[in-house]
Amino acid sequence: MPTSKLQANMSYREVIPRNLSPAEWIEVKINTGTQSTLQDLKTFETSGGYCYKNTKNVQTRNRFIYWRTYQDVLELSEVSLDISLQRNHLRLRFTDSAVLNVSLTEQGTSVTLLVVTVSSVHRYVFPLKVAGQEGGAASPEDLLSQSIFYDVNDKINDPSTYYVTDGFGTMPNAAVSYLTQDSQSAYFAVAYQSKLLLHVMKCSTGHTITHEIKEPKLMPWFLSNLKGALTGRSETLEAATSMAFSEIGGEIFILVLYRNNELRLWSVDNLQTVASINCSTELGQDSAAQGPQNSQLRKISDQNFCLFLSHNSRAEFICVSIMPDADDASVINLVQNMVPAPQTDLVDFDATSSHIWALWSNAEGDFHVSAAYFASNNAIKWVSAALEPPPDRYCLTMEQGVDPRETYCSYIFHPGRFDRNVIAKALYMFRRVNLQFDVKQLSMSVLKEQVCQAVEDEIQNELKDFVVTDEEYLEISTRLWDRFYSCCEQYHIKLSEPTGLAVLGGMDAVCLVRRQSFALLRPCEVLEHLLLIGEHNDEVATYVAPLFRNDPEMAKGFVELMNVVTLLDKLISEDIKIELDKQLYQRESPVEVISKLVARISMIDDNGPILPSNCVRQIQQKLQNIPNLEPALEMLLDVLCMIDPDEPPHDYSLSTRFLQSSGALMGSEYGLSILSETVKQMAMIRFSVCRNLLVLQYMAYGQNEMESENVLTNLNYLNSYYTLVWIAETPISSSTPAGFEASIQRLSRAQLFSGYNRPYSSHLKHNGNDQTTLLRLFLESKGLFSALTMLLKHDSLSLDSEQLNLRQSLLQLVGYINKMLWPGSPIYVFPEWLFGTCHHIIVQDYVRILSNWCSVQKHARRFMLAVSLLDCGEAHKAVHLFHEAESGIVEDDFLFEHVLKNTPLYGKLQNSVSRGDTISPEDTKLAIVHYYLKVIQLFEQHSALDYIIQLADMAIRVLQPDDPQLPMFQSIVFNNHLQLGHYVEAYTALVNNADISRRKDCLRQLVITLFQNKCLPLLMQFSYIGLQDEFESIVESRARSMSIDQNEVYNFLYAFHTNKGNMRKASTVMYEQAMRFQVDSDAPNALEKRCSSLLICLNCLHLVDSRYRWIAKPVLGDEQVITIDQDNDDGEPKCDEDKRGQEVVVLELADIRRELVHAEALRELSFYRKDTAAYERATPEELSYLLASSGLYTAALKLSRGHSFSVLPIFESLTSACVAATEDKSSDAWNWLQNNDMADLPHRSNAADMAWTLLQKLVVDNEAKDSTLIRKSVVQRLLGLNAFLPQWLINSYKLSHSRELLHLLVKHNRLLEAADLGCEIIAGMLGAGSEYFEFKHAVNIANPQLCFPISTIDLLLHGLKINGKDDLDYEMAYFKLEEEVQRYIETIKRTTDDKMSMAVLQMRTDLQEER
């Protein structure tokens, strides 16, 4: 059977472009200066269309213009299914002049518009923008996207473009226009009630000539052979109703159809009738007048025309041809096969050489389209086209507890359900106020807010005086929302009424023009024809037999089975279908759902059974009457199958090009909309077939046979087509979701989304359409070009040169798109794109719908779902899904491409697969490692640390203990435990790490982290088995690298070594800390901390074995310079060995103790002087003097105890301070007294007394035994200050060295005091008070001789004698001392004599004894 016959007898289906941008009209007003005629003429809304003929040109392929007129307005819209045109809507308003006729003609690079109004004729030329032929800076893409109306401006009112025909009295009732083939002249024929005028306009100048076409009184000779009579006509019957021009052999004719159904052919050249025939007479009609409908004439070609003739009892279509007879005269012949017209009202029709297309309406106002194929005797008479029904309010089901606003908004604002203008007009009606706004500037989201606010205002108006319950509120809300929906529905029905149709010949489609939009009638496929139309199915079986192995019986069985499926579809109510869809969406078992449905079909409830018993029996009987049911069922399943399971997989995901305005096939806004609507229509039809077929299978086989292969296949198809319907209907935002950029960046950084470009198209302007469907967005961004790639690859077509009609392009593209969307398809273009949209709710819903029945690409879907859940913050769910997807890393193409793409393993595995080799377990294991690494990178960007540990543990379980990748995952476990604060687990992980270097690195991180978080007790308790030296090194390095001012590491090290019992290391740490405080710190408490460190160091060393009580100290810079100076006068060490030897100094206890005393002295000084830092390098002696000068005498003396310098300056300073305190009665002395240690001193209320008491205590405490240096220094200082000596000092001195005190007094000219002391000394020597002096005995014959200070006494006497001349006190003192000296001399003499006598006696006694 030829394919043409199959195409000719298949029906068509309406496709409405939905969710389009609002039309932006170019408004042009044309004023010809004529009188208003609108009130005198009743005009009907007419429409038509024109399809570009040069369909091989990419620019004009799938491109057409449709128009509609109403009174004085002509609206033209240029549409391209391939190119998104700009400024493609033109509205011409012929001021007060109704439009009668519109025609469009194409001439190479321009389109001519001819318009006839009741008072004028117009000709406009619109150039077609061709790339390369236009000047200026416009790019080729911009030129291609410019509509022919793009440059419309005020020149359209140029007088040369129109001619005024007003002034002929009566109003015209018909008109026709024509542009000659050479484009030189434009002809306009205007018919009035009584005459016919012809206007001829020269295109070059616009000059117009008017002729009247008249019937002559006598008939010429060459008309004698015409059939029919030309007499007996009235004026009314002779009025023309329809006309058409024809150009044959360079001669132009006008074919005129009159009200009496007479057809005349007029010659334009001589304005004479060439031929005439009465169609009613030829067809055997009794009445010459036309019937209740207007007879119409349509031009097919210059030789062929189609007529619609209305009679009293019926109507019909006939075709006429202008054919020359043997005598070269023109005759009109009737075509033999006439087509009876249906008994309904004709709205409009169009005809081609093979089809008649008619738009009908009935008394109820319903419209339908039908077509007749009259080029073959085997044609089906009339085949109806399936028009899209209006939105069904019964699909709006209110669920319990759901807000009516949510339900109605989701339904009303579903993408494509209602046009934006419809909702806006409904809003005006609902508000009942004259408040309008620019719809073009109003997005759907804003319009939705306006609608919700309007309904809410109405609700509040009804409730403002009442208090209602929740149930009453919901009832009122539902009623008002239903009222608003009714407004939407009314406007939608009104604005969707068809006004005409036009055959788009080059596209194999029909344009159905509506009041506010248009639709295309596309060819149906077999299942659509059988389910929707159901006409002439027996003949269809004959025509489809070639598709079924040329077996007529099988084709007949297939059609009979589809008849039963169609019957069941009509019997099942829409409520049940909607309920079934909901149950499938909720992933209930289809078999259980169908079993419940079949049980309900036969069960009688309160409302009776769903289907009458006779219907059930009828269905069962029809099934039994199909002789070859099983083959027919298998054939139906083959037709439903969308993919070839034996076809090798192809990678179409590499089609990365996006839609450009320069145009891909079906790439414009209109093309994409028609394509997506067609996919949706076919998916819904096939889903209905699968659903009804499953019911029939259950009814035929019963519950026990539902596991057969055919049933399982149908179940798979049912779920698959439901998925396609879900994709086609699911709303999705046209713009990128929140967080899209962040999600894409995360995927890109993890190298999981680098195989293709961004998933959103940028060239299509949505103009406020916030939402579209998932399918539409997919086609816009990637789906169409992937489908075109498949079309070119499989069909070897050239889209740039070959002419493709809708049957070849649209249906094939739909087939390839279905293959991409098919859940069981190996092509992963759609899942990949959906994954990249980052619409997580939709991704999760998609995976859920396929979860429990589709095994193809299940690992990829788990991976997609896991990524989606991770982005949504549900990492705990994502972990398990990532683990489940692990096994598909080398099996699933999607995972293989996206996970392994940028790894070294990718090329190796790809070569193995291409050679057909089996992938080794080692490579599989390595692939899993790469998989987990990328997944871990993804989790790291989400900071999901807990789950990274789980993933790493999963990877570790896959690896062998000696695997080189194992330490990496162990390090990952450690790092994430560390970041989470699981320090014990982190330590365990680092100890178990198989790589020593990683173990040390991890230990360093652990130490640093624990120090930063102040977890020192935890750091102390770890055992560090095998890592202690490394640990100490790390801690020491950290201690030295940190500022000493905020450094707790030294204290930790001291505690650590102390805890381990290593006191020598503990002392070293403390000494190093003290050095750091000395060298690096400028903190106020640095000296305090240094002293504390040195003190701790001393304590630790005391606990060490005496053999190891030393510390090795590095020589500091200044110390090294001092050492060099000591080595050599020239400043150089003696040799390199000496220099190296001096780099380290060994310190013993005494050295450290001296350093401690020095530090404590500096600390004391720092309390009272701000310039202490300047004296840090001062010697101990210098420092002691500084302390003394600051009144810190006890501190200065403490410093001196560890050193050998003299303390005499300290006591001299203190002595001076005591004298000053005595002489100055102010309280300043208390300031320096409080800075000294007076804990053991009795309290005195007088500062001077406290000062002398302090001096006494310090002298006593610090004077060495048998030494008078300190007292001498104090006495000298007192004498030098001419101060009195305190009695305690004199008494102490007398007991130690009275003669020295006497000498000091004499030396400082304190003669009277010296005289008194001299008298006391002499008296003591003589035995009177000797216990107050250092004498151990008095002058006595039995005692040794005493040393008498004869020089001092002599000098004292001399001084007294000299001063006694002028002062009586000195004279008396002189005499008294002289007297005492004389007494002492006498006593000495006597004693000496006695000693001599005794010596003589003793000697004698000894001699006698010897004898």
Swiss-Prot record:
Summary of the knockout phenotype: RNAi-mediated knockdown in nephrocytes alters their cell morphology and function. Reduces total number of nephrocytes starting from larval stage and results in shortened lifespan.
GO-annotated biological processes: double-strand break repair via homologous recombination; mRNA export from nucleus; protein import into nucleus; regulation of nucleocytoplasmic transport
Protein transport is among the record's keywords: yes
Keyword entries, A-Z: DNA damage, mRNA transport, Nuclear pore complex, Nucleus, Protein transport, Translocation, Transport
Phenotype when changing residue 165 to A: In strain: s95
Top-level taxon of the source organism: Eukaryota
Consequence of changing residue 1408 to E: In strain: s191
Entry-linked InterPro entries: Nucleoporin_Nup160, NUP160_helical, TPR_NUP160_C, TPR_NUP160_M
Pfam families: Beta-prop_Nup120_160, NUP160_helical, TPR_NUP160_120_M, TPR_Nup160_C
Outcome when changing residue 127 to L: In strain: s82
Compartment annotation: Nucleus, Nuclear pore complex
Function: Functions as a component of the nuclear pore complex (NPC). Involved in poly(A)+ RNA transport. Required for nuclear import of Mad. May play a role in double strand break DNA repair. Essential for nephrocyte development.
Assembly and interaction partners: Part of the nuclear pore complex. Interacts with Nup98.
UniProt name for this protein: Nuclear pore complex protein Nup160 homolog
